[in-house]
Amino acid sequence: MLKCPETKTVWIYTDCQIKEDVSDIFDLIEEGKLYMVEDKPWTQRRGEVWHNSGVVGFVGKPPILYQWVKAVKENPTVGDQETLHSILNPITKIGNIADLPNRYNVMRLQVEHDSYKGPVSIMHWTGRKGKDRIRNML
């Protein structure tokens, strides 16, 4: 993410399926924060707000991006999403993360377990079962 030469960036994991034109996402992101979708399944199961790192929008290189990269390099044994969550508390999260609408990163668990019926612009095929679904689409 740090090496991306563009001013406005939307980072999308390779296990995400773009289901329609998502270019309007660039109209939602502004300087100074990471723009992410709340990870509704993790928030529900863990009892605190989590954001999913499958789709991350930002303008320029906000300071939190450097902190996140540094923390991932220092502790490569856990996932990047867990690392970001660990370096933020509820107050610093407000200053560093802004919510994107859910449709830009709908988790597999939302559809398969939580009866999500809303719009899906980007489907995130998480976990082993998600990777199996991707293989079946190829």
Give, region by region, the residue ranges found by the protein language model.
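Short, solvent-exposed loop/turn segments at the edges of secondary structure
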Residues: W50-S53, G118
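GT-A fold catalytic core of metal-dependent nucleotide-sugar glycosyltransferases
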Residues: M1-E48, G57-F58
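Short, charged, surface-exposed secondary-structure boundary motifs
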Residues: T43-H51, K131-R135
